[in-house]
Amino acid sequence: MSWQAYVDEHLMCEIEGHHLASAAILGHDGTVWAQSADFPQFKPEEITGIMKDFDEPGHLAPTGMFVAAAKYMVIQGEPGAVIRGKKGAGGITIKKTGQALVVGIYDEPMTPGQCNMVVERLGDYLVKQGL
């Protein structure tokens, strides 16, 4: 299965009548492996900050997490594995695997729990595949 198929079929899938606003699979260096049409472009320093937070959980909490210059308040995730952010009525979930970052961005009416489920389910699958 191609990386684009993972995004299209597993991240942008319908959940209780709703979809993520955008999603992507990135390398740890920020290289885009696959993305949805509306996925925002990360800046290199944003990826650096996200990767540092996986290595040093809590690093982003004081300043917030920036994605394409949009600021997200960092909320509880799983140290070293999942970062979650909130911005207005939407948010973001980032799951780190051995080689990739699985990213989902949502807006209402999709819920944080639905976004977490979609992103983390694919991320957990990739971890089991050694990716």
Curated annotation (Swiss-Prot):
UniProt keyword annotations, A-Z: Actin-binding, Allergen, Cytoplasm, Cytoskeleton, Disulfide bond, Phosphoprotein
Coiled-coil regions listed in the entry: none
Positions of modified residues (Phosphothreonine): 111
Modification note: Phosphorylated by MAP kinases.
GO molecular function: actin monomer binding
Motif (Involved in PIP2 interaction): 81-97
Disulphides: 13-115
One of the record's GO cellular component terms: cytoskeleton
Keyword Cell inner membrane: no
Superkingdom of the organism of origin: Eukaryota
Other information: The variability of the residues taking part of IgE-binding epitopes might be responsible of the difference in cross-reactivity among olive pollen cultivars, and between distantly related pollen species, leading to a variable range of allergy reactions among atopic patients.
Main function: Binds to actin and affects the structure of the cytoskeleton. At high concentrations, profilin prevents the polymerization of actin, whereas it enhances it at low concentrations.
Subunit structure of this chain's protein: Occurs in many kinds of cells as a complex with monomeric actin in a 1:1 ratio.
Family note: Belongs to the profilin family.
PANTHER family named among the record's database cross-references: PROFILIN
Protein name: Profilin-5
Lineage: Eukaryota, Viridiplantae, Streptophyta, Embryophyta, Tracheophyta
